[in-house]
């Protein structure tokens, strides 16, 4: 019997498809020689629901742990509240690969994708690289933050209560200036601690850890590796280190998100993509030297994209327009250490959650390669389940009556906390809003920037897409 293939997924967090093509020449070169899915759709608009969906092939809204209103509860961060994003007994992709005889290993630079959020369920080894990569540049500040986190939810409640009590002793005009000053100070402190103005956000450490794992612990069993690199995530290396990158100050109108500011952030993003592309080359080269590509399927993709002023939006975890829903998806097959030149370019809509079944098919021996045989999605779905930044919801709700700044941010967060679902079929895309905002319909082949809503002339098509979404089973590929 032939030996099972290694399967390695390199997930480049926050990389949007259009900019991957424009700013990552090595990835683009691989895509031309391998199999490239040109209309890959992320199942959700931020890390947690997207990974949860990819790991289970379930629609994100059907997973109770990821579909909560994090702004209302405040239970979003995995540190204070030790929140879980999948059930303890979830039969994840890693769990099922382990049952097929694979050694399953996770290398993560994302603090949500970790050993204690259950998104790592099923992996036999988890390298929480983010612990060092997200706090290596200001150890003193990191230690201070860690001491607060150890207090858990009780500590946060005390901090909120103390902040509100202090605000009540101030004149209202003073609350605004103090709150805004502290928020900007926090933004700069985080930037100083996590290397915002540097290019590397853990890629070098990831390559080192992967090489060390192969040298020390590789057991010659078939490998399923999942690697998350976070270089493309905000914040970004911009010219002035005093530049505020808090998206809620911009979305609320407190800071102006003009074209110059959006371009500045985008330039920083493209610098990171160029760096990430070079590290992708180094990672693939290391895997080849170590013999890990002798009989391997390599998948390169992302969990969501990023906004830079399009539709008046910034970053992600916002409404599902193309900039955040379309991601790169490239499958590369290696036989006897050499890349198989498939030269396939597929234009049909494919949800990245379809990787779940495609990878299991290779692991079980049903398929030998991933080269265009991944199931196209008749209706591909991308969901915005609400904003991810619910960490300060409780504080904002208590300060909003005394601070116009807090009120603006709180109301803006409420606005974008509205659920919305994008449903794709062929060239047509419906965005259905679960609130007091009208649905929108686009022909994304003719109008990829979604500038012209055509729903008034195509209501039957919009109804067809919405009905398909409502009637389908809670799996992403329907």
Give the residues covered by each predicted segment.
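Catalytic domains that recognize anionic headgroups
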Residues: 1-478
């Amino acid at each position: 019997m032939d030996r099972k293939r290694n399967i390695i997924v390199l997930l480049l967090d926050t990389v949007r498809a259009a900019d991957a093509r424009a700013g990552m020449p090595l990835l683009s070169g691989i895509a031309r020689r391998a199999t490239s899915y040109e209309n890959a759709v992320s199942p959700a608009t931020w890390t947690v629901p997207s990974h949860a969906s990819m790991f289970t092939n379930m629609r994100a809204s059907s997973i109770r742990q990821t579909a909560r209103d994090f702004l209302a509860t405040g239970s979003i961060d995995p540190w204070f509240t030790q929140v879980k994003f999948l059930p303890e007994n979830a039969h994840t992709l890693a769990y099922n690969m382990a049952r097929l005889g694979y050694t399953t290993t996770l290398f993560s630079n994302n603090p949500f994708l970790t050993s204690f959020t259950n998104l790592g369920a099923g992996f036999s080894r988890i390298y929480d690289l983010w612990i060092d990569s997200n706090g290596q540049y200001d150890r003193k500040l990191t230690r201070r933050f860690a001491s607060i986190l150890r207090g858990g939810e009780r500590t946060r409640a005390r901090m909120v209560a103390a902040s509100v009590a202090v605000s009540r002793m101030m004149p209202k005009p003073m609350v605004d200036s103090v709150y805004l000053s502290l928020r900007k100070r926090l933004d700069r402190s985080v930037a100083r601690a996590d290397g915002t103005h540097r290019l590397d956000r853990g890629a070098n450490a990831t390559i080192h850890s992967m090489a060390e794992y192969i040298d020390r612990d590789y057991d010659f069993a078939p490998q399923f590796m999942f690697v998350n690199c976070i270089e493309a995530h905000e914040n970004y290396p911009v010219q002035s280190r005093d530049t505020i990158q808090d998206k809620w100050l911009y979305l609320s109108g407190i800071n102006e998100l003009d074209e110059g500011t959006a371009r500045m952030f985008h330039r920083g993003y493209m610098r990171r993509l160029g760096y990430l592309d070079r590290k992708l080359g180094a990672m693939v080269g290391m895997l080849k030297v170590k013999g890990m590509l002798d009989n391997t399927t390599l998948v390169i993709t992302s969990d969501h994209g990023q906004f830079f002023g399009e539709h008046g939006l910034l970053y992600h975890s916002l409404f599902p327009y193309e900039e955040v829903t379309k991601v790169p998806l490239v499958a590369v097959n290696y036989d006897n250490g050499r890349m198989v030149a498939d030269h396939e370019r597929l234009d049909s809509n494919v949800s990245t959650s379809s990787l779940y079944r495609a990878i299991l098919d290779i692991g079980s021996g049903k398929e030998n390669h991933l080269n265009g045989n991944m199931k196209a999605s008749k209706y591909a779905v991308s969901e915005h389940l609400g904003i991810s930044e619910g960490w300060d919801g409780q504080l904002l709700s208590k300060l909003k009556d005394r601070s116009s700044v807090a009120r603006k941010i709180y109301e803006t967060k409420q606005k974008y906390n509205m659920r919305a679902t994008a449903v794709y079929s062929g060239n047509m895309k419906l965005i259905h809003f679960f609130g007091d905002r009208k649905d929108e319909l686009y022909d994304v082949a003719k109008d990829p920037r979604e500038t012209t809503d055509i729903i008034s002339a195509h209501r039957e098509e919009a109804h067809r897409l919405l009905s398909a979404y409502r009637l389908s089973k809670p799996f992403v590929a329907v």
